[in-house]
């Protein structure tokens, strides 16, 4: 018969092995998380930035392949996030993927549906809105982890508290602010009047504006692009206005690449249509279509999607301008 002290030692040893196994499992998840979704600080590191996981999509020229594979990749990342919910990199990565998918493969195709398919279009818009909000909330949780209480303060409705919590953000947070703000603003654009979401749009725009203050050239002016579209579409009561839209677009043109077709489409869609500027509209779309996707290998997907949008706008020009 084994001595009681031996049994105790065996039990303690087994417990240590179990704890070690749990620790190793956590370590493995943490290591995998860091590899697939570096912390937001990684955007300041050129080496880590070059290893951005979204490159497998942004460098792809087969839209169907991306549309079919992105949901699976998204769910893999979401499963990893369930195992490591406090990982800021994973929170941001899942948020980005939801917002990218909603924009490229839910909302945008719905915009191309004919008028007699308005029910299908509205269903797609409703789905896109939900995905935008889900993505924004995931990305927001990254900021909440970095700054406990961030969500409460940023949506408090108190201007002073909003400015105070945003003042804590640094250049490291610009990417996260961009995706949170973009997700909420995109959802707002698809939100029926009278819903509760407009109450959050002011905070979302403030996050985007804070991102511009901290890093105006981020992603070749990506934040200015979103703000241009928002300012042009939103009434002044929600912080919009054409004067602000034109100012944001000036910043965008300062930072964007000459091989970026999207800023031409933003100009045509957001600035030319409201002012009935048909000549500017046509010229901008022609410039967008003249760009060779192969000249932008790191952003080929965006070029192809943007040019598809440009062709649709040209084909429906009579819907936007008075004769």
UniProtKB/Swiss-Prot annotation:
A Pfam entry, by short name: TAtT
Disulfides per UniProt: none
Name of the featured protein: Uncharacterized protein TP_0956
Organism: Treponema pallidum (strain Nichols)
UniProt lineage: Bacteria, Pseudomonadati, Spirochaetota, Spirochaetia, Spirochaetales
